Amino acid sequence: MSIEFNALNFKKVALAAQDKLPKLALINLDDWGLITLIGDDKKSYLQGQVTCDVVSLPINASIFGAHCDAKGKMRTIFRLFNHNEGYGFLQRKSVMEIQLPELKKYAVFSKVDIEASSDVLLGLSGEQAQAVVEQHFPGDGDVRVITAGTAIKVDDDRWLFAIAPEQAEQLINTLVETHNNVQLSDSTLWDLYDVLYAIPRIDAVTALEFIPQAVNLQAVDGISFKKGCYTGQETVARAKYRGINKRAMYIVTGEATQFPFTGDALERSVGDNWRKGGTLLASYLYADGQAIALVVLPNDLDEATQFRLADQPEAIWTQLDLPYSLDDK
């Protein structure tokens, strides 16, 4: 059966909090956007704009980074990889309108073309994802050239495809016809993986609110402290060497009567009272009413601190362990 590439074919996979994740899912990442950078000066231009070391990016790997303002506040967090004749710059679609003009601001002085891409973004997730990629796109490395696009390994359970629109439908049908257990999902399943793996993100509602260390970007190798100057570097360096950062990103979980949105406020318990605690960056609401989220909080809280959503005060939330260390490497 041929499947037309239509967002309506990709629906939320109903999962309870105790359910196992699908063994294989194809995800429509329509909440994400891609910028491409092409030209002789693409590497040097981007190197002076972002927190990661673009110069050291291997051809077969991807890295995290942030694009900050002069005060070190992040406009966006992105995943960077080699794509077609240049770079692919993956970020949340909601920040594209405010971030792209800033990234292009000085491009007129360099040999670099920076544009929003029309490529379709698809995710492949689950314990079978790696084997499926090896079957259809064999090769070495975590970034692979495929027909009309690129395949990028995100983590042990996920691959990302950035592919031309005319090839997207063919890819979908190939995977559906070859693997009868593949589930088609909307982007909420990708959100769940990002929360479980504590992958930071910035949306329009949280843009220019946080410095990179406040969302653990250093813990996912998204900051180079050895590269040359870039916009916002002074603040990022002070946060590391002078300890000015007082926040971090954590995983929290609890019951929710309605979907918790990015930018929602989380309150924390202080004795018998409640005070503003932090800001929600990403979340997933299970079918049984449990929710899990990434939240920026003060980094000196007791692990026993309780939380609640400001607009849903009846449900108590608690903190979960991060999958990585926040200690300096």
UniProtKB/Swiss-Prot annotation:
GO terms for cellular component: cytoplasm. One of its GO terms (biological process) is RNA modification. One of its GO terms (molecular function) is folic acid binding. It holds the Pfam family YgfZ_barrel. InterPro entries: GcvT/YgfZ_C, tRNA-modifying_YgfZ, YgfZ/GcvT, YgfZ/GcvT_CS, YgfZ_barrel. Signal peptide: none annotated. It is found in: Cytoplasm. It comes from the Bacteria. SUPFAM superfamilies: Aminomethyltransferase beta-barrel domain, Folate-binding domain. The keyword Cell inner membrane does not apply. Folate binds at residues 32, 190. Keywords: Cytoplasm, Folate-binding, tRNA processing. Belongs to the tRNA-modifying YgfZ family. Folate-binding protein involved in regulating the level of ATP-DnaA and in the modification of some tRNAs. It is probably a key factor in regulatory networks that act via tRNA modification, such as initiation of chromosomal replication. This is tRNA-modifying protein YgfZ. It comes from Photobacterium profundum (strain SS9).
